[in-house]
């Protein structure tokens, strides 16, 4: 009987360590992404606030296509790495989630503090989703290749484009915001695999 409890305790401790590792890695990646987001905010202000969702989707799609091209061709003429593009995917997806919540603006209307606060809210919501899915799927993403994560991002983007073309309506599928959240998580998983520092 004691051996059974000991075994269960060992499994529980291992699971806690894996969860702690995932949260640490996740926070490290999102900290790097937010740092770049805020630096660009200083340079450009919140000009992105005028972008409609379809424009953000297209920007993310271009970045995902470029990553796939780099993975297949290994030749590049622009000095930006896959990591740079994944960070861009994360930040544009956060912008999209903010636009869904706050609506599109006609002018750059957010200051740095407001953007930082909203960024944290979106990332925290997305992290909570990741933790729930990790609970159900057992961190299956750790066994996936970066190229597979790229393909999943592209698939989600094609779904988002279709939903946008349907005026945001779905019959049985999750909405645009859920797809953007998944895209963020897939990109973060890719950066964890690539050991972003």
In which residue ranges do the predicted regions lie?
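Intrinsically disordered, low-complexity regulatory regions
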Residues: 5-197
């Amino acid at each position: 009987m004691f051996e059974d409890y000991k075994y269960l305790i060992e499994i529980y401790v291992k699971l806690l360590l894996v969860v702690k590792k995932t949260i640490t890695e996740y926070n490290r990646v999102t900290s790097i992404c937010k740092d770049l987001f805020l630096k660009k905010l200083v340079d450009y202000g919140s000009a992105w606030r005028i972008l409609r969702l379809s424009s953000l989707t297209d920007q993310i799609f271009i970045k995902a296509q470029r990553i796939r091209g780099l993975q297949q061709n290994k030749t590049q003429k622009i000095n930006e790495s896959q990591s740079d593009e994944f960070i861009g995917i994360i930040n544009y997806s956060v912008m999209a989630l903010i636009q869904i919540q706050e609506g599109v603006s006609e002018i750059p209307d957010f200051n740095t503090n407001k953007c930082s606060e909203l960024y944290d809210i979106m990332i925290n919501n997305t992290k909570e989703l990741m933790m729930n899915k990790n609970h159900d799927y057992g961190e299956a993403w750790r066994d996936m290749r970066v190229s597979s994560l790229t393909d999943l991002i592209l698939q989600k983007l094609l779904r988002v484009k279709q939903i946008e073309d349907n005026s945001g309506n779905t019959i049985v599928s999750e909405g645009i915001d859920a797809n953007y959240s998944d895209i963020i998580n897939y990109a973060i998983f890719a950066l964890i695999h690539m050991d972003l520092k």
